[in-house]
Amino acid sequence: MKKNSYMYHAGTSFFFYFAFACYNAMLALYLSDIHFNAQQISLITSSAPLFSIFAQPYLGTLADRFRSPRKVSLVALFITVVMNVIFMFSHQLIILLITSATILALFNAVTPLTDRIGVSSPYDFGKIRLWGSVGYAISAQLCGLVYDVIAPISIFVIFLFGTITVLICILRVNDPEVVETETKVEYSAKEAYKSLFKNKQYIIFLLISFFFWGACTANFTYISVFIKSVGGTASMVGTY
């Protein structure tokens, strides 16, 4: 198949979110079933957003420095493969915290990089991103089924399949073209942050986002455990 074809861009979006769903939808349920309590589950699941605070700007900076969001994405996703293997065979709190937080933080950080690759492609980004939603939905349902029918650990095998496939797809797409500008604007990071946090509308936006996404994330984290506690199955969690 021709390099940088629509199929590779669609495949990147599909399998990226396909793999992402394995952890995002099923992590809390898995931790509950291996006998972690609510406090331990919240500690593990809340660590990912904290890791993301540092991972997202760092990977963005690396992508700009090396002018290759594609290469940065490949390295980051390869690290998630290694972390996933460690996560699969560990039941120690600190190891599960570090590995799961690293995986989810890197996926959060790679999301804008893959979007950047898709936007710069010769294809309609909406038609590329649509496949990400399809991949997430299919994976969530599939993970629920194999969780019940085979074994809970099987969802991490699905993650490996999705991540390795998205690595192959990213290898077959092109980096965004770098547009050189004649004039370079020099600015101080300190001054930029200072002016940003003096912007009242920006602060209000941050507060709204904080409470909105905090509530959504709390609900999304524990809904799987709640469904299981009232007699539901992992398949129902995947459907939700």
Q: Where are these predicted regions, by residue range?
A:
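Juxtamembrane intracellular "pre-TM" segments in multi-pass secondary transporters
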Residues: 1-3, 173-207
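Helix-loop boundary and gating motifs at the non-cytosolic
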Residues: 2-49, 201-238
